[in-house]
Structure formats: C-alpha cells, structure tokens
A protein has these predicted regions:
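Active-site helical microenvironments for divalent-metal-assisted chemistry
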Residues: 2-166
Length: 166
C-alpha cells in the first residue's frame, strides 16, 4: 500500500517525536493516491466523494483532525489502506480513531456501527458529511431505481440511528 509520503515507509506516528503530523494537503494527496482508480456506484472517480465529504466537514466547522478523517474515512473500509498503515501514519490519534469509528466491519449490525460512531469524539460530524453526500438526490439520480431506493432507505435508517434530523 502507498504510504503518506508516497514512499515505502510511513512517517512516524504523531506525538512519537518521529515526525510532524501530516498537513491537510498531505492527507488529501495521500487519500487521492490510495483511492486512485476507484469509482463510486455511479462510476464517478471516488476522489470526488472524498472531496465532497471533506467540504461538508469544513462547512460544518470541523477541526483539522476531522478534516483529515473525512479524506480518509473510507480508506480502511475499501482496502485502500490497512489498519496497520493507518496506525503508523503521522496523524493525530483522534483522526485515526475517527477513521476506524466510521469504518464498517463485515457482518456488523448497523446499531453497533452507529453506537461506535456516537461513542468516538468527532466521528459523528464526519459521518454526517458522508451521509449528506451519499444521500444527495443528484448523486442518487445517477443510479438505477432499485439501487437508489435501497440506498435511500439505508441512509435514512442510519440517520435515525445516529439521531440526525431528516
């Protein structure tokens, strides 16, 4: 997998004295690199979704840690990064915790997923921005009707579990 600096060794963990935390621009570049070639359900470059979620976090007053988590929110879930690569990255522990909180686990009930998001400081804002982009009517319109209906129901259920108003 690709490391944050594009090389083969991750910069040291934030706070370890090994390296300064990655900047937002470095996190964005890393996320774009590890998701290169991926597309969303509508066939659009996946980086467009990452940028939209990051924009949503920024527009909602998110912290730099939340902004970094927005760029990386699907990296572990999609297999673009391993949990170990994330752990070794020069990122604040809060960012790593948020990324792991919003990473769905195989076979995990939605209630457990939502509870983890709610229990992790900062993760709810990242998930809110993710859901907002996922449920965007213009984005959903590009999908076939059965997929659109299934995803609309899925996103509405998750919003309810997270206590988010419709």
């Amino acid at each position: 997998m690709t490391e944050p600096d594009g090389g083969t060794a991750a910069r040291g963990a934030a706070g370890s004295g090994a390296a300064a935390p990655l900047t937002t621009a470095e996190v964005e570049a890393w996320a774009r690199r590890v998701h290169a070639g991926q597309t969303d359900k509508a066939g659009r470059p996946y980086a467009e979704h990452l940028a939209a979620v990051a924009h949503g976090v920024r527009a909602r007053g998110g912290t730099p840690e939340q902004l970094a988590a927005a760029w990386l929110h699907d990296a572990v879930e999609d297999g673009a990064l391993s949990a170990g690569e994330l752990a070794r990255a020069a990122l604040p522990d809060a960012t790593k915790a948020m990324v792991l909180a919003v990473t769905k686990r195989a076979g995990e009930p939605p209630e457990e997923y939502a509870a983890r998001v709610l229990a992790t400081p900062g993760a709810l804002l990242v998930k809110t921005a993710d859901l907002a982009h996922n449920a965007d009517p213009a984005r959903l319109a590009a999908l076939d009707a059965p997929t659109r209906d299934r995803l609309t129901a899925k996103y509405a259920r998750m919003r309810g579990l997270l206590g988010l108003a419709e």
